[in-house]
Amino acid sequence: AKATILLMPKFDINSLLALIHKHKVTIAPVVPPIVLAISKSPDLHKYDLSSIRVLKSGGAPLGKELEDTLRAKFPNAKLGQGYGMTEAGPVLTMSLAFAKEPIDVKPGACGTVVRNAEMKIVDPETGHSLPRNQSGEICIRGDQIMKGYLNDGEATERTIDKDGWLHTGDIGYIDDDDELFIVDRLKELIKYKGFQVAPAELEALLLTHPKISDAAVVPMKDEAAGEVPVAFVVISNGYTDTTEDEIKQFISKQVVFYKRINRVFFIDAIPKSPSGKILRKDLRAKIAASVPK
């Protein structure tokens, strides 16, 4: 088997669409920010994207709304999510949509664990294994995981326990059909009065607002609650009259009290890494610089 791989020097949505159109690309690995850019692009109709037959999403949780949007844009393509990390192979699970005999995919599912590995979910505080459908830290064990971090025994010891389980730092759960669902990064969870709030969940809701083209959620220190969720949003062209209260009310109607957005900051663009991941540390720095001590 053989295939041609197209590489882009940097991401630009119109360049991506033009490459697919020109070269009749068939397989597209994407991350959620690229899915967002595709779904929000006003120029999508200018390109023939019918050659796409497989869309694989990874790198971060893909919200149901974005997943549904992508399916609508590419009705003839197989769409699924996968999960993995460099330290472990890297592929750990893959959507059942890509199986030899495809199975209907549940929204948000990342598929089942690969055959040469074991997976379990543990309580991040106690290390005890958790039952199905209960969120905790994802742990993986198998011959494919790394031996350790080069010249960093301390980091290796924190990551791989005495029984050989690699603690991924990701929060997720396994359902009754052995499928994995990702919630968020453990270190990204916002701790509000003992409750845990996943930024990815709020970001997915924010992106359903018709006036928001991009969004990110990070914690802000709060004397009473410990931490509260705050949002950085990019407003779509033509909606400059959008207010902070409008966005806060939009979220409040859909979530329990401890997940409500405390503040909204308007920004020109969400800072992201070359792979499309949100640079949350940059946003936390903006908060530290703008909020009075």
From Swiss-Prot:
Residues 82-149 are annotated as: SBD2. GO terms for molecular function: 4-coumarate-CoA ligase activity; ATP binding; CoA-ligase activity. GO terms for biological process: phenylpropanoid metabolic process. It comes from the Eukaryota. Belongs to the ATP-dependent AMP-binding enzyme family. Both substrate-binding domains (SBD1 and SBD2) are involved in the substrate recognition, and are sufficient to confer the substrate specificity. InterPro entries: AMP-bd_C, AMP-bd_C_sf, AMP-dep_synth/lig_dom, ANL_N_sf. This is 4-coumarate--CoA ligase 1. ATP binds at residues 81-82, 86, 170, 185, 277. It catalyses: (E)-4-coumarate + ATP + CoA = (E)-4-coumaroyl-CoA + AMP + diphosphate; (E)-4-coumarate + ATP + H(+) = (E)-4-coumaroyl-AMP + diphosphate; (E)-4-coumaroyl-AMP + CoA = (E)-4-coumaroyl-CoA + AMP + H(+). Its EC number is 6.2.1.12. Carboxylate--CoA ligase that may use 4-coumarate as substrate. Follows a two-step reaction mechanism, wherein the carboxylate substrate first undergoes adenylation by ATP, followed by a thioesterification in the presence of CoA to yield the final CoA thioester. Pathway: Phytoalexin biosynthesis; 3,4',5-trihydroxystilbene biosynthesis; 3,4',5-trihydroxystilbene from trans-4-coumarate: step 1/2. It is an enzyme of class 6 (ligase). Pfam families: AMP-binding, AMP-binding_C. Residues 12-81 are annotated as: SBD1. PANTHER family: 4-COUMARATE--COA LIGASE 2, LONG-CHAIN-FATTY-ACID--COA LIGASE.
